[in-house]
């Protein structure tokens, strides 16, 4: 069993109510909000909450996916299927200059690749469509720089984050006032934990990308990470042969930069049980979080989510 007690269900309902309140506040307060959809488990929960917030209607904002062109194939298939099911507009943005220049995580390194294909691409999209608020699925328990984030994260006209220039958030009162060109990144899942996310997915029967479930997959070991060979673009090193292992992913990103974990957890109760025994962060498998000192905070200051 998943071990979700009645008290635990009450806790999840409180988190749900808080998130729905935040989503409705943004829809009421901002002129042109958007929901960033990264296709991961947190995005799936956030989308589910948005649909609940405006049921039986459709959420009054579009979904947007910043596509680096290096996502897992199963992620893109899942994205297209979910967009069709929920009936929301899906905006896909690719940094065409970066793609034309052939920017990739192998020849250019994870730091430059992330800056060009994620950070700059996101800023391009926000400017192009004039969004004044963008929902994201980040949680405070994920990583140190995210632990000090506000629910409403103020960004200047260059989309930069200054942790010393943020607004107080008293109780459930949020200040969304922005000048022309400024914006707010909004994190409705700020107070959720990874365990909360999984238990809520189980209780609400929320569909997620199959990569979260353990299965035999071809992987190679690099820098202590199990990298899945998702397509022919992954260059194999001399003598490197993919090995089929039972693995799953705790977090999903670009496949050359996302490490799998060895696991046999193929159902939600098994994943939750595994979570209860795990003592490492889910983002320990994301190379972009460790490519330089203070990596995530530096990226956020430059405009990353």
UniProtKB/Swiss-Prot annotation:
One of its GO terms (biological process) is sulfate assimilation. Residues 283-305 are annotated as: Disordered. Pathway: Sulfur metabolism; hydrogen sulfide biosynthesis; sulfite from sulfate: step 1/3. Signal peptide: none annotated. It is an enzyme of class 2 (transferase). Coiled coil: none annotated. GO terms for molecular function: ATP binding; sulfate adenylyltransferase (ATP) activity. PANTHER family: SULFATE ADENYLYLTRANSFERASE SUBUNIT 2 (PTHR43196:SF1). Heterodimer composed of CysD, the smaller subunit, and CysN. With CysN forms the ATP sulfurylase (ATPS) that catalyzes the adenylation of sulfate producing adenosine 5'-phosphosulfate (APS) and diphosphate, the first enzymatic step in sulfur assimilation pathway. APS synthesis involves the formation of a high-energy phosphoric-sulfuric acid anhydride bond driven by GTP hydrolysis by CysN coupled to ATP hydrolysis by CysD. Belongs to the PAPS reductase family. CysD subfamily. This is Sulfate adenylyltransferase subunit 2 1. It comes from Chromohalobacter salexigens (strain ATCC BAA-138 / DSM 3043 / CIP 106854 / NCIMB 13768 / 1H11).
């Amino acid at each position: 069993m998943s071990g979700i007690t009645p008290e635990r269900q009450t806790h999840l309902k409180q988190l749900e109510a808080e998130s729905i309140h935040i989503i409705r506040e943004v829809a009421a307060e901002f002129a042109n909000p958007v929901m960033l959809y990264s296709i991961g488990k947190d995005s799936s929960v956030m989308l589910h909450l948005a649909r609940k917030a405006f049921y039986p209607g459709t959420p009054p904002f579009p979904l947007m996916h910043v596509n680096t062109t290096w996502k897992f194939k199963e992620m893109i298939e899942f994205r297209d299927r979910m967009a069709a099911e929920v009936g929301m507009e899906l905006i896909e943005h690719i940094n065409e200059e970066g793609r034309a220049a052939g920017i990739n995580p192998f020849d250019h390194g994870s730091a430059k690749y992330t800056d060009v294909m994620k950070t700059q691409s996101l800023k391009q999209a926000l400017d192009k469509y004039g969004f004044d608020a963008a929902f994201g699925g980040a949680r405070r328990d994920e990583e140190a720089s995210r632990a000090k984030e506000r629910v409403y994260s103020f960004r200047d006209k260059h989309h930069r984050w200054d942790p010393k220039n943020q607004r107080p958030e008293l109780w459930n009162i949020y200040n969304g006032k922005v000048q022309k060109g400024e914006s707010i990144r909004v994190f409705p899942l700020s107070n959720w934990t990874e365990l909360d996310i999984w238990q809520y997915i189980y209780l609400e029967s929320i569909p997620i990308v199959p990569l979260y479930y353990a299965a035999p997959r071809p992987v190679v070991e690099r820098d202590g990470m199990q990298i899945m060979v998702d397509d022919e673009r992954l260059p194999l090193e001399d003598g490197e042969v993919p090995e089929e292992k039972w693995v799953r992913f705790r977090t999903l990103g670009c496949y050359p930069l996302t490490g799998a974990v060895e696991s046999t957890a193929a159902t939600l109760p098994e994943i939750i049980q595994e979570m209860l025994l795990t003592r490492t962060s889910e983002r320990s498998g994301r190379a972009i979080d460790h490519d330089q000192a203070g990596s995530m905070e530096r990226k956020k200051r430059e405009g990353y989510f």
